[in-house]
Every structure is written in C-alpha cells, then in structure tokens.
C-alpha cells in the first residue's frame, strides 16, 4: 500500500503547494490512480505515528474540553476496531452511527474504515420511521448510538449488534469497553479503493431519501478538492458548524481538515448562541471557519469587529450566501467569505479558492479535478443550464452511484452526471447559482430564479429567511410569491409588508418583483433545507380555492406603492 499512499500524498502536496495559484492547480492537477487504499490505515495512521499535535478539539459552552492528538486517535481507533471485530463486525457490514459531536464519533469512523465496514451516518434527530427505513433499505447490521437514544431502537425488529456510548442501556454493549482492547490492529485483508465506505440517506426536498454510496476513495481522496477550496494548511485549527449525520460533517469535520493535517475544532451548544460561538473562535485560535448561511445571518447581527480573531479563511456552504452577508463580514473582519458548491454525491466541485478574485453572488469556478459544464435538457452546453460533471475522465470525488431499494448499485450512465441544480456562467468562467432545476419558473415568459429574489429579500432587516415560489396568476401565468420567516422584533402586519415591498422595488427589476408575500413558518427537511415543493403545493391549492392566508399581503393592497 506504500506506493498507493505515496500517490495520494503527492496529489495532496501538489494542491497545498498551489493553494494560491488556481490556474496551475486546475490545469495540472490529476487525481491519484489508486488500486488498494485504506485512508485510515495507509494515510492517517502513518501521518499520526508519533504525532502529538492536536487532531480533535471538542469544546462546550460549559467550559469542558476534550483534546486528542493524531497519535491518540490512531491508537484509540485501533482499540475500537479490535473491539468491534470481537463483537462480530466484519468487512462489508453496515454500521448505523448515530452520535453527536463526541470523540467516539471520530474513533468509530476511523475504526470502521480500518475494518472495511460501511458506515451509515445518522443524525440524532431521526425518529422511528427514519430508523425503520435505514434498517430496511440500508441493511443495518450494527448500531452505535448514545445510551440516551437506546429507547428509539426498542421496537425495531432484527438481530443486530447494539453498542451504547456515554452510559449503560439494557441489552446494549458498553462502548467504553473498547478502550481495554489491544492497541495494535491488523487488517484482515486489503481494502480496494472502490470498496464501499459510506452510505448516505440524502435529505431530499421532494421524495424519500436517495441512498448515496461512497467508496474508500470518493470521499477520503475526493475531499482533496474540499481541502483546496477551504484553503487549509497543516497546523490550522478548522471549525465547521455542522451536525453529525450529514455529508457536510464528513466534508469539513473529518476528511478535508485531516487531509491537510489540520486540527478539527467543534463547539457543542445546547442552543445556538452567536456570542458564545464567537468567543470560542477567539479562545481556540480558529484559523479557518465554515458555516451555513443560516449561521452567517445570525452572526452578522453581532458587532463582529469586537471579536479579535486569528481567522484567515472564511467559507460558506449548504446554500449560496447572499451578497449582503458577505459585505457585512468583510466590513467587520476584512475577510471575504468564499462560497463553494458540492453535494452529498460529491466533494466540493465549484468554489472560490484562496487568493482568487471573488465576484459578488458567484459561487466560483470549477475546482481541480472537476470538469463542470452547463447542459440543457438535450445535453447541449449553454451559458445557463444544469450543473453537470463530465465523466470522461470520471472525477474521483463523485459517488459510486445510488443504491436501489433492493440493495443493488445503480451506476451512473451517460457522459455526464447531472446535479439537478441550475447555474449561469460568465465570460470569466464564474458560476452563479440560479436554483434547483425544479425551482426555477416563468412569469410573463421571464425566467425567475428564486434564489436571486430571496437574496434581495433577506437584505431587509425584518426578514430572517425567505422562500420564493410561483403563485398561479390569470394574467402572468405565475407571479413570484415569498413566504417569509420574520426576524425577532418584527410583527406580521401591514406596515412590515409595506416596508418589504418598498425594499423590493429598489432592488429588483419590475419583471422580477415579488408580488405577494406571506409571513409563515417555513417547512424544512430534517437537515434544515426549505421544502419549497411543499410551499408550491400549498400555494397552488390556495389559489385554486381562491383562498388567501391570514398573514398574506399583495402589492395591490398598497395604493401608496403606485403603479408598477
């Protein structure tokens, strides 16, 4: 495996060397060609040998901390792997891993990789129906969960291993018994780079989750592109605001930082507290920070300049960031939040890497290792179209495929992988997010991008979140309607609606303007994505019945706005 690992290291060093030179990195980077490769054994353990630098730093609002070195995590994961093997975990077995941000989460990920087992990451928010689905379609053989979550599994049928973390549960093995296992680990055979490693249940906004299968190279090696986008360096302290169970956690709390030999920092808060988070960034000396738009929007409500940080790189992920938020952070800290784009199915494929010009509203250019094209429904390249990845050559940072309900792998077909997202490309190759392919709609024959309208909406102080959908209209076919979650201190009343409509008139061309707004709680998936499909259905039904919401306002309600 030494030669294979050397190829991975060579690719890593190339990207670290050219972290500020996008043109060279994109032109000359080649994915390492791997046959047999186990990232935990062939890279992490080798890098961790005698390495007492911090690898994992877990903090809480209460002041408690856990800090583990690379060497300690390597040894602890060896012990866990030996313990799991003794409990019957075999190569290819599926392990449902449902833990919060506690050290055993990272130990189990490494241990499962060493064993050749397949991890099904799961959020602690799952209910019984979610678990039944993961047992049935995921073919779960073993469960590692917090002792306080054991009751969720009480009525689930099947013969599966139960391991409880953080306490005792009747009928469950105690996780802490693993620390008494042998400190040396010997694999039972070679791991092929194409062997399965992770099975994600995606949080679809329209249907039941798809099953995304990743291999021992598609995420561990593929996230070299994520490392490059973030701008990570050896010795960095990287903080990514994310919950376990979602792909972004593996992206930026596991593979990308450890590919760069950086320390993963996490803050556990019972309830989100912006000031507490900012205090932790200062206290831990965080150098690179990634957060979803929702968190950034809450952070900019603070006087950010009052926190003197060691931050060098700021990135946003999950959904594109609105220009207003980027501008506020730049004014406070002198650092530009750089957007990026990827999916559960891929590593980071588009982004603004360090040292490159950032265009307002653009999510960046294709990252090294990805050939990104915009295609129409017929497969022709366009300046605006669906974001697609060319498969010749196939990028390493792309899933093996979707697993069918019967357990078979549904491989990708054709010459390109279609993401389902739409973007526009400018003359310099920068891509600007338009929306999900099924979210974009027409009004009076004009194409409307919900994201563009939502970006203008949240610039208003009263708007915490917004989702724009088509509202059936007898004249224009459809007009943009915004469902708005109000910021604290604002009431769902006429004056608020009038202020928002006035703001929209200054920020949008007449054909793009939101004509109807409704103050409401936004429906979301378990991962926090807005379920626009539900809002579209709700709006279509309301218009079909000529029904209007109690907190809904239309432009025509306000004669003081004038014509337009």
Give the label of every model feature segment.
Residues 52-54, 170, 180-201, 207-208, ...:
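Conserved pre-ATP/AMP-binding loop-to-beta segment of ANL
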Residues 62-63, 148-193:
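ANL superfamily adenylate-forming
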Residues 66-71, 197-221:
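Conserved AMP-binding A3 loop
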Residues 126-127, 143-146, 289, 415, ...:
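AMP-binding/adenylate-forming catalytic core of the ANL superfamily
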Residues 220-237, 244-287, 302-303:
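Conserved AMP-binding/adenylation subdomain of ANL enzymes
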Residues 259, 286-291, 300-359, 371, ...:
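Gly/Ser/Thr-rich phosphate-binding loop
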Residues 334, 393-420, 437, 450, ...:
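Conserved ANL (AMP-binding/adenylate-forming) active-site segment centered on the GW(Y/F)…HTG consensus within
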Residues 366, 378-410, 448, 542-544:
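Conserved ATP/PPi-binding loop(s) of AMP-dependent carboxylate-activating enzymes
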């Amino acid at each position: 495996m030494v030669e294979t690992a050397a190829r991975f290291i060579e690719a890593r060093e190339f990207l670290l060397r050219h972290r500020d030179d996008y043109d060279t990195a994109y032109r000359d980077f080649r994915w390492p060609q791997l046959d047999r490769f186990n990232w935990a054994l062939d890279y992490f353990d080798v890098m961790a040998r005698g390495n007492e630098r911090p690898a994992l730093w877990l903090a809480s609002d209460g002041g408690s901390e856990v800090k583990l070195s690379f060497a300690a995590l390597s040894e602890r994961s060896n012990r866990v792997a030996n313990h799991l093997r003794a409990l019957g975990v075999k190569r290819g077995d599926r392990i449902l891993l449902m833990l919060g941000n506690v050290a055993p989460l990272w130990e189990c990920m490494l241990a499962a990789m060493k064993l050749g087992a397949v991890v099904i990451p799961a959020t602690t928010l799952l209910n019984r129906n979610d678990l039944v689905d993961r047992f049935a379609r995921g073919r779960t053989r073993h469960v590692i969960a917090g002792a306080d979550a054991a009751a969720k599994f009480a009525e689930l049928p099947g013969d599966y291993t139960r391991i409880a973390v953080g306490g005792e549960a009747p009928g469950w093995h105690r996780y802490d018994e693993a620390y008494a296992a042998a400190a040396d680990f010997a694999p039972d055979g070679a791991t092929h780079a194409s062997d399965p490693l992770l099975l994600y249940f995606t949080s679809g906004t329209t249907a039941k989750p798809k099953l995304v299968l990743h291999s021992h190279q598609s995420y561990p090696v593929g996230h070299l592109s994520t490392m490059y986008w973030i701008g990570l360096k050896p010795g960095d302290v990287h903080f990514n605001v994310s919950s376990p169970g979602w792909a972004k956690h593996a992206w930026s709390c596991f593979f990308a930082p450890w590919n760069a030999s950086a320390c993963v920092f996490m803050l556990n808060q019972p309830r989100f507290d912006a000031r507490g988070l900012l205090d932790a960034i200062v206290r831990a000396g965080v150098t690179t920070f990634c957060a979803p738009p929702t968190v950034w929007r809450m952070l900019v409500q603070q006087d950010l300049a009052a926190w003197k940080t060691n931050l060098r790189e700021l990135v946003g992920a999950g959904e594109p960031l609105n220009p207003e938020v980027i501008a506020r952070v730049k004014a406070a800290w002198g650092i530009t939040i750089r957007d990026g784009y990827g999916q559960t199915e891929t590593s980071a494929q588009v982004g603004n890497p360090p040292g490159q010009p950032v265009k307002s509203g653009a999510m960046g250019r294709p990252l090294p290792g990805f050939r990104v094209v915009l295609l129409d429904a017929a497969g022709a390249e366009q300046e605006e179209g669906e974001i697609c990845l060319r498969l010749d050559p196939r990028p390493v940072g792309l899933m093996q495929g979707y697993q069918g309900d019967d357990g078979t792998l549904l491989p990708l077909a054709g010459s390109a992988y279609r993401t389902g997202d739409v973007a526009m490309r400018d003359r310099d190759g920068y891509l600007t997010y338009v929306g999900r392919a099924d979210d974009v709609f027409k009004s009076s024959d004009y194409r409307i991008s919900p994201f563009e309208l939502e970006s203008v909406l949240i610039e208003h102080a009263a708007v915490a979140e917004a989702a724009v959908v088509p509202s059936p209209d007898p004249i224009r076919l459809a007009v943009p309607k915004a469902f708005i979650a109000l910021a604290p201190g604002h009431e769902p009343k006429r004056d608020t609606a009038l202020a928002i409509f006035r703001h929209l008139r200054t920020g949008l061309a007449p054909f793009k303007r939101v004509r109807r707004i409704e103050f409401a709680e936004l429906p979301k998936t378990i991962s926090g994505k807005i379920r626009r499909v539900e809002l579209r259905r709700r709006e279509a039904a309301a218009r079909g019945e000529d029904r209007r919401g109690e907190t809904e306002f239309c432009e025509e309600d306000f004669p003081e706005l004038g014509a337009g």
